[in-house]
């Protein structure tokens, strides 16, 4: 083979290479486009597949939880569970919130009992103090 023939063949190969590369690139981008359209179709056909609670709902829940407003936190947690029934964190928080509410209720009942006992002892103490105060007033007048 002569040098001219070899050079001519290389030029032919070089001419075809860019086209081949462009074809391969367009094929790969076409494949990518098809993949995304398939994913879009899957998402459209099953809209409840990955339903998430709104971010605002989540932040309000965290604010209520951190602010120890357990009644509000319980309601917000229930709403999150409506959106995401299988959310493990929401399930765990829900049971913990219920425990906290029971503890608060028990504590409030104890405080109410303590206050009622204090009220009873104060009213008994006042009734014994009243006659002595009146007698001291009478002494001053005399």
Swiss-Prot record:
The gene is ERICH2. It comes from the Eukaryota. Residues 1-55, 104-142 are annotated as: Disordered. Residues 9-27, 44-53 have a biased composition (Basic and acidic residues). Transmembrane segments: none annotated. It comes from Bos taurus (Bovine). InterPro entries: ERICH2 (IPR026703). This is Glutamate-rich protein 2. Residues 28-43, 109-142 have a biased composition (Acidic residues).
């Amino acid at each position: 083979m002569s040098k001219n023939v070899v050079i001519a063949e290389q030029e032919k190969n070089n001419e075809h290479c860019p086209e081949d590369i462009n074809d391969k690139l367009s094929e790969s981008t076409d494949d990518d486009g098809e993949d995304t359209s398939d994913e879009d179709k899957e998402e459209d056909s099953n809209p409840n597949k990955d339903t998430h609670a709104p971010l605002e709902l989540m932040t309000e829940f965290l604010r209520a939880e951190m602010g120890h407003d357990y009644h509000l936190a319980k309601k917000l947690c229930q709403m999150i569970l409506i959106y995401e029934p299988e959310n493990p964190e929401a399930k765990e928080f829900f049971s913990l919130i219920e425990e906290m509410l029971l503890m608060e209720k028990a504590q409030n009942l104890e405080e109410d009992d303590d206050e009622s006992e204090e009220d009873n002892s104060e009213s008994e103490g006042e009734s014994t103090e009243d006659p002595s105060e009146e007698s001291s007033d009478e002494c001053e007048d005399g």
